[in-house]
Amino acid sequence: MSDVSGRFVVAAAVVAVSLAMAAAAAAHDYGEALSKSLLYFEAQRSGRLPYNQRVRWRGHSGLTDGLEQGVDLVGGYYDAGDHVKFGLPMAFTVTMLSWSVLEYGEEIAAAGELGHALHAIKWGTDYFIKAHTHPNVLWTQVGDGDSDHYCWQRPEDMTTSRHAYKVDAENPGSEVAAETAAAMAAASIVFRRAGDAHYAHLLLHHAQQLFEFGDKYRGRYDESVEVVKNYYPSSSGYKDELLWAALWLHRATGRREYLDYAVDNADDFGGTGWAVSEFSWDIKYAGLQVLASKLLVEEKHLSSQQREVLEKYRSKAEYYVCSCMGRNPGGAAHNAGRTPAGLLFIRPWNNLQYVSNAAFLLTVYSDVLSYLSLPLLCPDPDAAADEAAPAAADAGEVLEFARSQADYILGTNPMATSYLVGYGEAYPRRVHHRAASSASYARDRDFIGCLQGFDSWYSAAAENPHDLVGAVVGGPNGNDVFTDHRGAYMQTEACTYNTAPMVGVFSRLMELERRRRGEDAPPSSTSPVAEDDL
């Protein structure tokens, strides 16, 4: 059974795991965190803002994007605290938002946030439809990172280059084509479930074309669009994105050809070979390994070969989970780093992106373990082939670890600081973000020049005029220390792909808390959202 015939229903075993975690549950308001996370995406919007825009200190921006190239590229998201629209991280953001809704849509609906979640996804997919102007053409970037970083302006005042860049048959970009295909395929399932069959079909049509384009004309996108190399280079190549997109297309269509692609190319493309400790906009292996593992739960008519290969994917998914939890034999070489207070620590620059992605994958994988009634296994690579690996953790422990990472983000940390802006009493007040750090365009329309903003806003010791509510910033250093200063951009800049996976995590934990308190599910509606509202 594929996602075509219905969503993956969390089994009774998952409920039992949730109840068993009652004693360890934290006193955080995950519903509030969820609501604020979704609000953040409205602050990152580019283009003509809708009448129901909730972040009122933002205005229309980028209204001539694509004009120079004769294509309409108005819309989409700014990735972080600047104003370039980077296609690869934007697509990954939409994929993770969609996956969050697919896994925990009922919980999101119960919180009254399903409409906002669909809006957030559609703001991205509407842009991707515009950017995919031909079966073998995808516009992947608007703006220039170098000139953009030279200025500190509100997006409404931009004077920097809005040159647009594309990939095509002569200048391929398999990573961005495949990731955009994955995003549109995942979103198509979301909107089909929401009752918008026409829009779902349109997204799926684009997703299939983009996958075919990325697979037929293979090449690294940062070699075709070289200006992206200083910002979003591809370190893992494009094979992980191709496998990732194929699995999403299988879930969206139920067609065997996409599953066969992921099975037949599993070894050659590294899907069953790469054992990793990170999941990000660049390196998709852990994500596709968890996604493949879910097929063992959802698919009822797998061939023996398919099941064998999917089990290989699952073994690598377990390596990732074991690495995050520090359970892999072999010490530091096989396990993700930690701060003294227990936060996963992969890199100093924007470390919380890796934490939020890990929290999401571990949350999803704990549900897989519950359904299969299996423990987490962390085998010793030096053990004999016939030596069974001991159980390293159960599903409840995996979910508990994911919760610990979410709670750290929400303020259970040595700094007693929430790294989700706007949550709690103490949170970053000087986020590295041009719009949030400047006067509201809605109240003060006096033009802010390119360099003027550095003197007036960037260098100021004062707090930002606007809280970037719902943003997950880069986070503390390896010693759990955080510096709340705009110049400390490795720690204070937030990105869309930091927050996107937390939508799913907060939704799952919100439901966990409800069960802990023994409450009935609140009345909710998963009925279709009116097309006019989207």
Swiss-Prot record:
GO terms for molecular function: cellulase activity. It is found in: Secreted. It catalyses: Endohydrolysis of (1->4)-beta-D-glucosidic linkages in cellulose, lichenin and cereal beta-D-glucans. The active site is at D82 (nucleophile), H432, D484, E493. Its main location: secreted. It comes from the Eukaryota. It is an enzyme of class 3 (hydrolase). Residues 1-27 form the signal peptide. This is Endoglucanase 5. Residues 515-534 are annotated as: Disordered. Belongs to the glycosyl hydrolase 9 (cellulase E) family. Keywords: Carbohydrate metabolism, Cell wall biogenesis/degradation, Cellulose degradation, Glycosidase, Hydrolase, Polysaccharide degradation, Secreted, Signal. One of its GO terms (biological process) is cell wall organization. One of its GO terms (cellular component) is extracellular region. Its EC number is 3.2.1.4.
